[in-house]
C-alpha cells in the first residue's frame, strides 16, 4: 500500500474510500490531491484543521496538494449534513471570507496550489453546465444520494439538489486542468465525492486514474463534535479565538480523547504518539498528554512566541501567582481570552467597593468573608483589611486581577 494511505490508515482517519488501485495509480503518476474549503465563515476552526493536517501529510509524502476554495459554491452552501436550507451569504462577505481562508491555507501550505472555483464558473453559462455536466449524471443516481433522500420529505430546493453536480464539476475541472486525481473531504462528503468520480468516469473513461476518500468525523468520547467550546467554535484566526483560549481548550480535553486528537490534528508519527500516551497513562493527573497536545497544536497554528506567552500566562495565573510579572502583551491576550468586567474606578477607592460594583460577587458580605478567610488576592497582594484602598501595586498594566482561591480569576478593566 502507498505510504500516504498507510499513514492515514495507521492513524485511523479514513472512513470511506473508493477503488484503492485507482488511487495508487493516481499517486504513481504524480497526480495531485485536493480538498474543498467552504468560505461560509471568515476562519477555519479547529475541528476543520483535520483536513489541513491530511494535506500536510500528503505534502510530507511528496504528493502535489491543491486547496479549492468555494468562492462560487459558498454563495449557495453545501447541503451535506444539513437538516434545512442554508441561509445564503452576501457577495461582499463571501469575498472577504474567501480571502481570509486563502491566507490561512497559505500559512500552513505555502507551496499548495489554491484554486477559487468562482474563477472558472464566472465564464460558464447555465446551458454549458447542463451540457457538460448535467448530461452525464442521471436523476435516479442523484436521488439515491443520502443527502437528497434525507431531505425529500422536509423539502430540498433545486439549488441544493444540484449542489453535488457543481462539486462534481469542481473535481472534473481540477482533474483536467490541474492534474488532480484524488479528492478527500469530511465524513459528510462521500456523496459529493462519488458524484465527481462518476462524472470523471463518464467523461474520461473507465481507466481514468481518479479516486476519493472521506475522513472520519472527529468526535469526543461523549459523542459531541470536537472543535467547539461552551463559548462557540475554536477558530484558527487569533482575532476570533486567542492562542490562550485555544491552549486552555486543549489542556481541558479528556484522557479518553487524547489518542484520537493526536492522530487527527497533530503532526506526530504513530510511534511518538503512542510514547506520549504511554507516559501520560503512568500519571494521568499530571496531564502530560494534554500539555503535549496543546504545545504541538498552538505552536503549529500560532508559532513558538505565542506558545511561550500562553505557557507563561498559565504558569502565572494558575501556579506561581506573580500577576505583576505579566507583560503588557500578555495582559492583552488575557483580556481577549477571559470575561472582562468593565467598571469605572480610581486609586483612592476601597477595593471592596470596586469589586462590589463589578458584580462578580453576590454581595459585600461575601467579599468580607473572603477577606476574613484570607481568600482574596488582588494583584499579588492578599487583602486583609475591609478598608484597603486600591494601590498601583494592585494593578497590572492598569488592570485589576482579583483571585478567589487557586482557580477563580476575575478581571476588571477601567471603563
From Swiss-Prot:
One term under GO cellular component: cytosol
Binding site for L-tyrosine: 34, 163, 167
Location of the motif 'HIGH' region: 39-48
A Pfam family assignment: tRNA-synt_1b
UniProt entry keywords in alphabetical sequence: Aminoacyl-tRNA synthetase, ATP-binding, Cytoplasm, Ligase, Nucleotide-binding, Protein biosynthesis, RNA-binding
Alphabetized GO MF terms: ATP binding; RNA binding; tyrosine-tRNA ligase activity
Compartments in which it is found: Cytoplasm
Location of the S4 RNA-binding domain: 349-414
Assigned EC number: 6.1.1.1
One of the GO BP terms on file: tyrosyl-tRNA aminoacylation
Catalytic activity: tRNA(Tyr) + L-tyrosine + ATP = L-tyrosyl-tRNA(Tyr) + AMP + diphosphate + H(+)
Residues that, per the record, bind ATP: 228
Coiled-coil ranges from the UniProt annotation: none
InterPro entries: aa-tRNA-synth_I_CS, aa-tRNA-synth_Ic, Rossmann-like_a/b/a_fold, S4_RNA-bd_sf, Tyr-tRNA-ligase, Tyr-tRNA-ligase_bac-type, Tyr-tRNA-ligase_bac_1
Extent of motif 'KMSKS' region: 225-229
Subunit structure: Homodimer.
Biological role: Catalyzes the attachment of tyrosine to tRNA(Tyr) in a two-step reaction: tyrosine is first activated by ATP to form Tyr-AMP and then transferred to the acceptor end of tRNA(Tyr).
Family as reported in the entry's similarity comment: Belongs to the class-I aminoacyl-tRNA synthetase family. TyrS type 1 subfamily.
HAMAP family: Tyr_tRNA_synth_type1
NCBIfam families: tyrS
Protein's UniProt name: Tyrosine--tRNA ligase
Species the sequence originates in: Mycoplasma mobile (strain ATCC 43663 / 163K / NCTC 11711)
